[in-house]
């Protein structure tokens, strides 16, 4: 099974990289895990709404270029649906049981995801109403995907 996270911009901070590398290593037992980075657009503070929409649209096109038709896509969105870790694990298990072997998660850039990306998504996941930095979101999501596999496989990691 293939799990892909698409993120906007390069991850620079060593501590995020180290955390993600740890979960990527652990996930190697359960799936082919990859993180795909697409270039971000400059988004200075002074942008108008139209300019912000353009930034999201451009980043969105780059994200959509990395998604194939067969992929089941989760968009990470603050206003999406919240789940518990157990519910998420059940959902992943069900998707694989019903033949989805390519699952892709999309995290927006500093301004968020474009309407086109949200439209392509098969489901939206919210990690609550807090706004998390997109780099940190990659780490938190990697951990939750790992947690889901430990739940599916009955390992004692999840309490
Ligand atoms: C800095 S946030 C963008 C904030 C933007 N105002 C928005 O509402 O999307 C960057 C990305 O991280 C992800 N993200 C941040 N907090 C999240 C949360 N609580 N739940 C789900 N995704 C989140 C989303 O993919 C978002 O597009």
Swiss-Prot record:
The keyword Glycoprotein does not apply. Its main location: cytoplasm. The keyword rRNA processing applies. Gene3D superfamilies: 3.40.1280.10. It catalyses: pseudouridine(1915) in 23S rRNA + S-adenosyl-L-methionine = N(3)-methylpseudouridine(1915) in 23S rRNA + S-adenosyl-L-homocysteine + H(+). One of its GO terms (cellular component) is cytoplasm. S-adenosyl-L-methionine binds at residues 76, 108. Keywords: Cytoplasm, Methyltransferase, rRNA processing, S-adenosyl-L-methionine, Transferase. It is an enzyme of class 2 (transferase). One of its GO terms (molecular function) is rRNA (pseudouridine-N3-)-methyltransferase activity. CDD domains: RlmH-like. It is found in: Cytoplasm. Its EC number is 2.1.1.177. It comes from the Bacteria. Specifically methylates the pseudouridine at position 1915 (m3Psi1915) in 23S rRNA. Homodimer. HAMAP family: 23SrRNA_methyltr_H. Belongs to the RNA methyltransferase RlmH family. This is Ribosomal RNA large subunit methyltransferase H. It comes from Limosilactobacillus reuteri (strain DSM 20016) (Lactobacillus reuteri). The lineage of its organism: Bacteria, Bacillati, Bacillota, Bacilli, Lactobacillales.
């Amino acid at each position: 099974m293939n799990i892909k996270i698409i993120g906007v911009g390069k991850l620079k901070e060593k501590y995020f990289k180290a955390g993600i590398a740890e979960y990527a290593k652990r996930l190697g037992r359960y799936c082919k895990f990859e993180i795909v980075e697409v270039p971000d657009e400059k988004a200075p503070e002074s942008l108008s709404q139209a300019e912000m929409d353009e930034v999201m649209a451009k980043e969105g096109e780059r994200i959509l270029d990395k998604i194939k038709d067969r992929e089941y896509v989760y968009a990470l969105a603050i206003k999406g649906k919240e789940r518990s870790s157990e519910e998420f694990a059940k959902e992943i298990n069900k998707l694989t049981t019903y033949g989805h072997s390519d699952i892709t998660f999309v995290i927006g850039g500093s301004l968020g995801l474009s309407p086109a990306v949200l439209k392509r998504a098969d489901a939206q996941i919210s990690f609550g109403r807090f706004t998390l930095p997109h780099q940190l979101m990659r780490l938190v999501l990697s951990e939750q995907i790992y947690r889901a596999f430990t739940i599916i496989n009955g390992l004692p990691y999840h309490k």
